[in-house]
Amino acid sequence: MATYAIVKTGGKQYKVAVGDVVKVEKLESEQGEKVSLPVALVVDGATVTTDAKALAKVAVTGEVLGHTKGPKIRIHKFKNKTGYHKRQGHRQQLTVLKVTGIA
């Protein structure tokens, strides 16, 4: 069984292993920079670590591969009988990370 971790970033949690490429909420880091992510849980074979003191020593490191945008989300607000309608779109900014280590 492989080693993996659950990391928290941008208000979401992601399951990552070494070598994974994940898209997370935008981080204020440049391309090629190293980043460290807070860990919520670590699974190493049959050993599951959730203790806060033990997790304080664990670090998940990654490298920023670049920045991108998510899919377009269309918002349409409409009120009946008043002629009010509003169309809006949004594309979330994302950061592409490659996980380089769980230590």
Swiss-Prot record:
Pfam families: Ribosomal_L21p. SUPFAM superfamilies: L21p-like. This is Large ribosomal subunit protein bL21. GO terms for biological process: translation. Coiled coil: none annotated. The keyword Ribonucleoprotein applies. PROSITE patterns: RIBOSOMAL_L21 (PS01169). This protein binds to 23S rRNA in the presence of protein L20. GO terms for molecular function: rRNA binding; structural constituent of ribosome. It comes from Mycobacterium tuberculosis (strain ATCC 25618 / H37Rv). Belongs to the bacterial ribosomal protein bL21 family. GO terms for cellular component: cytoplasm; plasma membrane; ribonucleoprotein complex; ribosome. InterPro entries: bL21-like (IPR028909), bL21-like_sf (IPR036164), Ribosomal_bL21 (IPR001787), Ribosomal_bL21_CS (IPR018258). HAMAP family: Ribosomal_bL21 (MF_01363). Part of the 50S ribosomal subunit. Contacts protein L20. Keywords: Ribonucleoprotein, Ribosomal protein, RNA-binding, rRNA-binding.
